[in-house]
Amino acid sequence: MNKEQMTSLILAELEKNPEITNEGLADILSVDIAVIKERIVSLSDVREKILIVDDEVDALTALKVALESDGYNVIEALDGFEGISKAKSETPDVILLDIMMPGMDGFEVCRRLKSDPQLSSIPVIMLTAKGEVDDKVEGLEMGADDYVTKPFNLKELKARIKSVIRRNVI
């Protein structure tokens, strides 16, 4: 059972019995109580969610800390395959996507995200050292909503994140 199905079942049970305990939900749904607790916490987290897909751990960690300090819920993925998987399971509000990664590069990740009906509406900001005009054009033509080159100004990146989230809500 995936997270969305689990969430739907939990909400259905809570609608039937608002006083039910986590233990009661775990018994009814035949799952470990830790799974119930994780889904309940997830349901109550209303912060905007950002998925960062980057194989450079130091850069990812620094950016994660900076965005979390602004109140974002930040999820991380270290390669393209994990990025697609987390996009499906976590449904972020925006994805920050590096291009140069092993296994599957960011262009291919973006193409797959934008061709998946479940994920195509999630804004993607390419965040990469590839700053040539042809790279920018390719990223934007793949469906990226914005393109920021490394090194970047954190204040500008935060403004761009707010902008794509705002455009996506309207």
Can you annotate each of these PLM segments?
Residues 101:
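Receiver (REC) domain active-site loop signature in two-component systems and cognate sites
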Residues 5-8, 108, 131-148:
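Alpha4 helix (beta4-alpha4-beta5 surface) of REC/receiver domains from two-component response regulators
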Residues 47-58, 63-67:
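Conserved acidic segment of CheY-like receiver
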Residues 85, 107-120:
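Short amphipathic alpha-helix used as the core "switch/output" element in two-component signaling
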Residues 54, 98, 128:
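Active-site residues of response regulator receiver
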Residues 44-45, 90-96:
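Active-site beta3 strand of CheY-like receiver
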Residues 76-85, 106:
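Helix N-cap/capping motif at the beta->alpha junctions
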Residues 152-162:
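C-terminal output helix
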